[in-house]
């Protein structure tokens, strides 16, 4: 059986490793701009203006990085 590719984890991990600033759009319309410091199956740890915020993934609509993310899909 071929391993399935988890694009979400690859995308978030590359943003974290590169230190790319990202705008996180929440379902309620609120926007947070910061850096991804970590993530798991349910949450994303975002550093915003030197402070940490733990965001539940079910509250997130979109991640918009300030530059394109390069990662392997195969």
From Swiss-Prot:
Domain Sm: from-to ranges: 9-69
GO molecular function, one term: RNA binding
Any single biological process term in GO: regulation of translation, ncRNA-mediated
Pfam families referenced in this protein's UniProt entry, alphabetically: Hfq
Transmembrane domains' residue ranges: none
This protein's UniProt keywords: RNA-binding, Stress response
Any single Gene Ontology cellular-component annotation: cytosol
Function: RNA chaperone that binds small regulatory RNA (sRNAs) and mRNAs to facilitate mRNA translational regulation in response to envelope stress, environmental stress and changes in metabolite concentrations. Also binds with high specificity to tRNAs.
Subunit description: Homohexamer.
Assigned protein family: Belongs to the Hfq family.
Record-linked NCBIfam families: Hfq (TIGR02383), PRK00395.1 (NF001602)
Descriptive protein name: RNA-binding protein Hfq
Name of the gene this protein is made from: hfq
